[in-house]
């Protein structure tokens, strides 16, 4: 499997995020998709992993923003299965253990975390398979909408790319938009028991830096569309 990271003008946080996967033989490659960071920052990242064959680094020719860069990261993956992660979060061996604890990976399922520690706790939904057939009854759960906009999950590469839609840039509602399209296509989001990571809330996050650019009313519109699937 591939672990794919999106990043922009980050070094130390990125290195912390990547570290747990370097020695794990279950991970065939770590992809870093750099969204046209400053030249000196990209040069530092490239030098950091120059002798690490498992790490493959790509730089966009221009800044695509988070939603489109996620597609780039997945496109660069050479494995059938991909964990798409944010570069300002931290992970552990147990994150991968939880993925491999699933007896069989389903190409139409996305495996979502049950807990983005410490603030975003979705364990009330743990073990739930969410589809367009039951989203109406599940979404009113206060944490479900947050979970659908959290990403940091595991899926089939080709199915992700098939569903991905280029018609708008949802900015900070990017995960919610993709997950709406994922469910609309007849796929499932599984809140995976034991799948947890540390989700850093900070002023330099993509959300904090860009929430004002998100199209007015888009988040609420997507939640309404999910109810009506």
Go through each PLM region and give its residues.
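Active-site donor/metal-binding and catalytic loop motifs
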Residues: 117-118, 192-211
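Conserved donor NDP-sugar-binding/catalytic core segment of glycosyltransferases
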Residues: 96-126
């Amino acid at each position: 499997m591939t672990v794919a990271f999106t990043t922009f003008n980050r070094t130390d946080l990125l290195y912390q995020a990547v570290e747990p996967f370097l020695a794990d033989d279950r991970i065939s490659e770590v992809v870093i998709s750099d969204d046209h960071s400053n030249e000196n920052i990209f040069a530092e990242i490239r030098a950091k992993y120059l002798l690490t064959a498992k790490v493959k680094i790509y730089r966009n020719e221009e800044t695509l923003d988070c939603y489109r860069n996620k597609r780039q990261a997945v496109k660069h993956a050479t494995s059938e299965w991909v964990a798409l992660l944010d570069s300002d979060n931290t992970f552990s061996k147990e994150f991968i253990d939880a993925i491999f604890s699933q007896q069989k990976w389903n190409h139409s399922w996305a495996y979502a975390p049950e807990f983005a520690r410490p603030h975003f706790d979705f364990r009330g939904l743990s073990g739930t398979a969410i589809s367009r057939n039951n989203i109406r009854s599940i979404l009113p759960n206060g944490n479900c909408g947050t979970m659908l906009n959290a990403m940091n999950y595991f899926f089939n590469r080709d199915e992700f790319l098939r569903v991905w839609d280029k018609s708008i840039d949802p900015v900070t509602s990017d995960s919610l938009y993709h997950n709406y399209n994922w469910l609309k296509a007849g796929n499932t989001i599984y809140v995976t028991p034991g799948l947890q990571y540390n989700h850093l809330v900070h002023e330099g996050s993509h959300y904090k830096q860009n929430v004002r650019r998100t199209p007015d009313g888009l988040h609420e519109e997507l939640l309404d569309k999910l109810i009506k699937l």
